[in-house]
Amino acid sequence: MSKKTINGLPLHPAISMFKEEVLDNKLTRREFLARATALGATSVAAYSMLGLVAPSAAMAATPKQGGTVKIQMHVLGLKEPRTYDWNELSNFSRGWLEYLVQYNPDGTFEGRLLESWSSNADATQYILNVRKGVRWNNGLKFTANDVARNIEGWCDKSVDGNSMAARMNSLIDPDTGKAAAGAIVVLDRDTVQLNLNAADIAIIPGMAEYTSAITPASYSLETMLSNPVGTGPYLPDGHEVGVKAALVRNTSHSWWDDSAYADRIEFIDYGTEQSASVAGAESDEIDMVYESTGDYIDILDGVSGWQRSSAVTASTIVIRCNQEAEVYKDKNVRRALAMAVNNSDVLELGYDGRGTPAENHHVCPIHPEYAELPAQVVDRDEALAMMSAAGLGDYEHELISIDDDWRRNTTDAVAAQIRKSGIKVKRTILPGSTFWNDWVKYPFSSTNWNMRPLGVQVLALAYRSGEAWNEAAFSNAEFDETLAKALAIANADERRVLMKRLEQIMQDEGVVIQPYWRSLYRHHKEGLLGAAMDPVFQIHPHLLAWS
């Protein structure tokens, strides 16, 4: 008889409540799977509670050992993992730096370097069970001390750009900005206990973020490539920013898992213009693209021997004002810009209608705690009047974006909408190598955001006061206090009451213009396994294989 939980303990009491929410059509199947497995239910048990059979973990075709896989992807300058700010960084280092927990395309959470975990009833204490038999590729054993050390590092708010601190907020002493005394306890070589300062239903999902790669005690950014100690099955074999990077299978390492197939994986950077990727596909220079966007989705459909995969997600783009900029401190200025933009029109013009309109609060209808608000009004006359009342009727706003296909086009569409109101806007388009350096600092710019399983995760990461990724520089005491309460509530209906207020604050304060939620697409060669589009852009090197 199969276990219902990954640790053999009884199911967490909240899981039955989640099941009732599904039956009452208050929670989607995907969100139930995410929340149940985050609280320790096995995937099999979570599916069976809904009367479903879990999909087989086996690949659809038999993978062959060996070969090379060539992937179009931006090759960015490496950073310390907790300061990663783009998925591409993690997809390369994932070859040797692994994760405690993995978020799967079906919405479930799977233990990797953690074998299992459990939570008490009110989600204020977690027990993390380290996977036995794991070794670093230098021969040392992977233990609970490694887990505790990494979590302690995630909690250090003094590290510039450390977004993991936002995810570990319930472990942090607000006075020191570091892990609270007694918050992280090593019980024995294989067990870590987390004692939270407040209930937190998002702690395990936070450990699945691409910024949470597990590093050794000897880690330094300077020796990340020259001395690549990790637990994974690959090693770096060259890394040239903006050009190319590669991984090779580490044949001298006894990896704890046994499913690494490709001998070599190459990441080739063609820049931000996707026409180069199409040329690479047609000339057999690459085997898959990182993402297919815009008109190139249909163009890549026509490449012989290639196939399309897709994922419906809560991925999005936001156009935000940085509220530390003098001109954008006035919320009426920010609201005027939002009032001038018809999000449905931007979806059609910027992303060819491949998604659904959003509502300027960064919480998606697929999030379990989403609260429906009245439709926003587009009133360009009022927008200009508000801007003029703020003394900026003749001011020319500079709207910045990266120079690529869909993000450039979407930002162009937003600028055109604002101009229709009579508000002046000029566009500045930056190459990726420039844009990525200061994406959180621009006064008025657009940024793409990945999905997170819970709406409260997104708001805590992107809009809580003082967080590393708070690119809007938004700081609102009522918002922070309400968010803290919402993060402690497991019941989606109860949390939705607070979420409605959070969404309203986002709109009232004009924090973002959020045009749409987007569907994701990727093309790859037929016969390449492990290459399907992932809802959070993960590429797992150990799953890539030729059939």
Place the predicted regions along the sequence by residue.
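Structural transition elements
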Residues: 339, 354-389, 406-409
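Ligand-site clamp/hinge motif
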Residues: 219-222, 252-299, 415, 424-426
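Long beta-strand-rich cores associated with HINT superfamily self-processing modules
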Residues: 522-547
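N-terminal lobe/hinge region of extracytoplasmic solute-binding protein
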Residues: 72-121, 152, 229-230
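Periplasmic binding protein-like
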Residues: 71, 139, 291, 416-466, ...
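Gly/Pro-rich hinge or "lid" segments in bacterial periplasmic/extracellular proteins
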Residues: 104-108, 199-266, 272, 381, ...
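N-terminal secretory signal peptides
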Residues: 1-31, 50, 54
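Surface-exposed binding/hinge segments that line
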Residues: 164-217
